[in-house]
């Protein structure tokens, strides 16, 4: 399972963002089931960043959000992410992927 959270970060906020995003990547990396967690910057648009993590399974990813430390490190940062779907899995694991109802 792959989780990709993208961020648009103004240059004057980059230093603070990188510090918080590195802490989030380290937090993810310390959680059971996390295969890798990386903070990456776009090659063409320096204001575009991603926090990308790979997980053994979706359950491990979801459990990484449990607990007080997760609320302190992950939630404030991820609330700044671009609002778009962020979780991906092998199509065989996903099955028929139907959009959620907006009503």
Question: Where are the regions a protein language model picked out?
Answer:
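Short, well-ordered beta-strand segments in beta-rich or mixed alpha/beta enzyme
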Residues: 2-7, 38-65
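An amphipathic, aromatic/His-enriched active-site/gating alpha helix that lines ligand/cofactor pockets
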Residues: 26-35, 54-87
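Short, surface-exposed ligand-recognition loops at beta-strand->loop->(often short) alpha-helix junctions
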Residues: 8-19
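Glycine-rich beta-strand-turn "strand-cap" elements at beta-sheet edges
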Residues: 38-47, 73-103
């Amino acid at each position: 399972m792959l989780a990709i959270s993208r961020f648009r970060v103004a240059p004057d906020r980059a230093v603070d963002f990188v510090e918080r995003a590195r802490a989030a990547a380290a937090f993810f990396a310390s959680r059971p089931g996390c295969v890798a967690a990386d903070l990456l910057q776009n090659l063409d648009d320096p204001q575009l960043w991603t926090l990308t993590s790979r997980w053994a399974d979706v359950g491990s990813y979801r459990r990484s959000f449990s607990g007080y430390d997760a609320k302190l490190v992950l939630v404030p940062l991820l609330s700044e992410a671009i609002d778009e779907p962020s979780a991906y899995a092998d199509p065989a694991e996903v099955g028929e992927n139907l959009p959620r109802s907006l009503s």
